[in-house]
Every structure is written in C-alpha cells, then in structure tokens.
C-alpha cells in the first residue's frame, strides 16, 4: 500500500513526511477493518480508499486558509482526518450525528494519537460555534443551499469560508446561491487515478 500511496502523491505533486504517510496508511487500515462491521463507506478495497478517500481529501489542503476548521457530516472522517494528518498545525472539529461513526473517529484519534482533531456527535444545526471557524468543510454532505442554511452560524463573519467538495460543477446550485454569501473561488481539482470531475467551491459570508 505504501508504494501505491507514494506513486499517487508523486503524481499529485504532494510532499509529506514518512510519518504522515504511515498515519494515512494506518487510517486506511482502520477504516477497512471497521468498515466490515460498521459499514462506514461503500468503498471496500483499501487501494481504492487511497484514491477515493485519501487523495480526494488532501488535494484540497493548499486551498484552505486559517487554523480552525469544522468538517460537517464527516462520516468516517472525510476529508477531516486526512487533512488533519497533512496539516498538523491546524485543528479540525469532526462533526457527525451518528454514534457509530463518532466512535470510529475517537478510536482513530486514540490509535493514531492525533491531537489536532475533536470528534463531536451532533446535528450541525445544534452545534454552537464558539468561537466561529475559519473554514466550514463538507464533502458529499448536502447542496450548497442546504449547507449554507444549516451551517450559516459556523464561519467567522468576515474571514470565514465555506469549502464544498463537489464532483461535476453544480451550475444550478451556483446560480441560486442564497443572499448573504458570495462565490469566492471555484477550483478544478486533479486527483490521480480518479475518474470524473472534482471541484472545490469556496464561498464567503457577505
């Protein structure tokens, strides 16, 4: 698995330490093991997890600004745990409403000794942002409209951003953004060995 990860990182032009690579592989091992009992992801092959979960998450890292992030609807920790591993100077709150997912996140935190994540079991609407976050991240969570509606209380008013990971660019969602947010940036992401388009949509509170 290490050779596959090295090849993917080289293809993406991403440089991380051996320790970070080992942590990413440990995370995939744990996800694969727990997935058999808890059904945390539809991806069953660890090699595919490297592409569709690890690489698909960490290609976003250069586009994040700030130190405090919240990953809403994180599921088994995606993209929050891979991002926390490659961005150790930042802190990631991992929010999910399902107990089995949060139990998995806490076990990952314990076994990988990740000090820069905080798993939380809560509905996003009920979670207080005190203080507000630099970035609100979502991957396969909801439409842009729902994300903004449910998460509007989470980012800092002037400096905070919404980061939505999408496949094909959702032009219909972009054309009907609610009042109070502005489109800041659209980034076409390149994920080695992953078929289909990937985009990062960055929105800012107005």
From Swiss-Prot:
<keyword id="KW-0949">S-adenosyl-L-methionine</keyword>
<dbReference type="GO" id="GO:0005829">
    <property type="term" value="C:cytosol"/>
</dbReference>
<feature type="binding site">
    <location>
        <position position="78"/>
    </location>
    <ligand>
        <name>S-adenosyl-L-methionine</name>
    </ligand>
</feature>
<feature type="binding site">
    <location>
        <position position="139"/>
    </location>
    <ligand>
        <name>S-adenosyl-L-methionine</name>
    </ligand>
</feature>
<dbReference type="Pfam" id="PF02527">
    <property type="entry name" value="GidB"/>
</dbReference>
<keyword id="KW-0963">Cytoplasm</keyword>
<keyword id="KW-0808">Transferase</keyword>
<dbReference type="InterPro" id="IPR029063">
    <property type="entry name" value="SAM-dependent_MTases_sf"/>
</dbReference>
<comment type="similarity">
    <text>Belongs to the methyltransferase superfamily. RNA methyltransferase RsmG family.</text>
</comment>
<dbReference type="InterPro" id="IPR003682">
    <property type="entry name" value="rRNA_ssu_MeTfrase_G"/>
</dbReference>
<dbReference type="GO" id="GO:0070043">
    <property type="term" value="F:rRNA (guanine-N7-)-methyltransferase activity"/>
</dbReference>
<keyword id="KW-0489">Methyltransferase</keyword>
<keyword id="KW-0698">rRNA processing</keyword>
<feature type="binding site">
    <location>
        <position position="73"/>
    </location>
    <ligand>
        <name>S-adenosyl-L-methionine</name>
    </ligand>
</feature>
<comment type="function">
    <text>Specifically methylates the N7 position of guanine in position 527 of 16S rRNA.</text>
</comment>
<protein>
    <recommendedName>
        <fullName>Ribosomal RNA small subunit methyltransferase G</fullName>
        <ecNumber>2.1.1.170</ecNumber>
    </recommendedName>
</protein>
<feature type="binding site">
    <location>
        <begin position="124"/>
        <end position="125"/>
    </location>
    <ligand>
        <name>S-adenosyl-L-methionine</name>
    </ligand>
</feature>
